[in-house]
Amino acid sequence: INRKKMKVIITGACAVSARSVLRSLKMSPLFESTEFVGWDMCNLLYGVYEGIFDRIYKVPAVSDVSYRAVVEDILNKEKPDAVIVVPEVEVLYWSEYTFDVPYIVPPKEFSKLVISKERLFDALKDTRLVPKHITLTVNEIEDPSFINPLGFPVWIRDGAAGTASGKGAFKATCYDDLKAWVKINQGIMQFQLSEFLPGGNYGCFCLFKKGKLIKIAQAERIEYIMAKVAISGVTGNTSKGRLLNDELIKNTALDAISRLCQITGEEMNGLVVVDMKGDTNNIPIITE
């Protein structure tokens, strides 16, 4: 093992996920002498002043035309040994527009497909790997003649690409619930309805290199951080969970990844997190 002093940049440094990644790395003796640098849009100032990074740079959004020039200046200055790209929209950018630094992300077309729940679900709709679903505009839901083909209860959430952590999510038990939720969330123009899955909440973490599965881990999310502040109870990261070793969860995740790579014609690289919820029989169904 090369124990030289390394420098690692972690993107999305102010958000919960990137900070969790850093805390995990710092628990390993392999990284005890590593210098950790972050960058972020810095909207969440707590992440700036928490102090777990050696330093943090403020960068524009990935959609900003100046993004590439700003991060290339940082890369040229810091000369990192590796970059860990965390936010989904940033992973999508780095999969399409490469940088001359060591990093590993999933392939471009795969990333474009799975960043959208609608495209992901449509790609796997002929399997039982994903829930029954439908994507609707606000006008379609508010139409007095609308009939929910999925029945109730139903899970409604923001249908835009890149949404995660239960954004705009709610368990609707009747049509009045749907209308009220649409009315409350006026900034959301498109909603996804999917069958409500009452079972366990699972994550399967699969690390690939050149098509080969290197590591795999599974966990059950039992409680979320500050769960009561979100009506869905889903706030992003867990405060309580447990590790699992379940063949069905593993096989479900790998089956979906394989099918999607066949669709895109690509070789898998990087870390893929497959989120699942158990159905009425607690059979894991992919949600993200």
Language-model regions, residue ranges each:
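ATP-binding N-terminal substructure of ATP-dependent carboxylate-amine bond-forming enzymes
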Residues: 2-105
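Conserved ATP-binding module of the ATP-grasp superfamily
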Residues: 130-133, 167-198, 257-264
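Conserved metal-phosphate-binding beta-hairpin within the catalytic cores
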Residues: 260-288
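A conserved helix-loop-beta module that forms one wall/lid of the active-site cleft
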Residues: 96-169
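ATP-dependent carboxylate/phosphate-activation module, predominantly the ATP-grasp catalytic core
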Residues: 195-201, 205-261
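Helix N-cap/beta->alpha junction signal
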Residues: 14, 87, 116-117, 174
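Short amphipathic alpha-helix with an adjacent loop that forms part of the alpha/beta core around
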Residues: 67-77, 143-149, 183-184
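Glycine-rich phosphate-binding loop of ATP-grasp-fold ATP-dependent ligases
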Residues: 132-133, 153-181, 201-205, 225-242
